[in-house]
């Protein structure tokens, strides 16, 4: 959408990047072309693997099955602890990719259905919503083959993008990284947008699970996890929450891992409001 200045405004996420023709957005994955913004990473596959669905992590949806998992490049957040910075924090000229169409991915997913128990396609590894058009088109192709779609996302997207995708997403794990906008200022996101995504997907009938990575000194207080679990419970107390342990990565290699006792304590606090709380990386 043009803003009348010769620039185009990207409406994929709350950042609303203003882009001159040919410019790339903050996410490194969207580009201005004339009066519109397109996914520069459309069909660009950096990573592909057949994973147990529990690895997403999704614990209460087709447990014991596998899901063909694909990623591209780019992300609209800058979490200093990113575990996939090799693809999420780099652009298309820095990430080695192969090209695939939605139909080709759907055919590959179907091939693994009988041989290896594959239930469908998971959009993951980088932030899939910065290339939401490819997610939408692939999800439609998967549905035509009678298979399922799984989204693993930071959830920081516009209401319009979520509304476009929700009818085709069967299960999702959304990161709720912290309890407030103050935390999201640190990682470069929008707290209310993430909360809205969780609520919208749940309202659409999608199976939703949530992950919170516990970072020492940032979101590891009792009040932090209580606020996170209170919001989730306001949507549904039955939404599973994964409380996971931080390990030093990317720009936080000098930090210490979260003590296991801290993760377990916070999980116990979350269980006061939520019926299904799991610990991860412990």
Q: What are the functions of these language-model segments?
A:
Residues 32-171:
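Conserved Radical SAM active-site core
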Residues 86-88, 94-96, 186-190, 255-256:
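Short glycine-enriched, charge-decorated loop/helix-capping segments at active-site entrances
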